[in-house]
Amino acid sequence: MDPKKIARINELAKKKKTEGLTSEEKVEQAKLREEYIEGYRRAVRHHIEGIKIVDEEGNDVTPEKLRQVQREKGLHGRSLDDPNS
């Protein structure tokens, strides 16, 4: 997210505590917060999709649902042609 937008979120939060927000500012704050949260969710999803889980013996124990996503995106050498990957 753009640092200016984050600064604006913080500015509105500070103003809300000190003097309150107008209805327009409340709408702006809600939109900015939603944009921030969506970006955060995307980053977490991207991070999780890049994880490969292995046990103590080195066996891949990544959950099947995550493996399917990785196959679709071609991550970790997983292939849609090989369901065992």
UniProtKB/Swiss-Prot annotation:
Region Disordered: start and end of each range? 62-85
Superkingdom, taxonomy of origin: Bacteria
Could you tell me where this protein is found in the cell?
Cytoplasm
Keyword set, alphabetical order: Cytoplasm
Main subcellular location of this protein, as a coarse class: cytoplasm
Which GO CC annotations does the UniProt entry carry? cytoplasm
The UniProt entry, under Gene3D superfamilies, shows: Helix hairpin bin
**Family of this protein:** Belongs to the UPF0291 family.
Q: What PANTHER family does this protein's entry cite?
A: UPF0291 PROTEIN CBO2609/CLC_2481, UPF0291 PROTEIN YNZC
Entry protein name = UPF0291 protein SPCG_1462
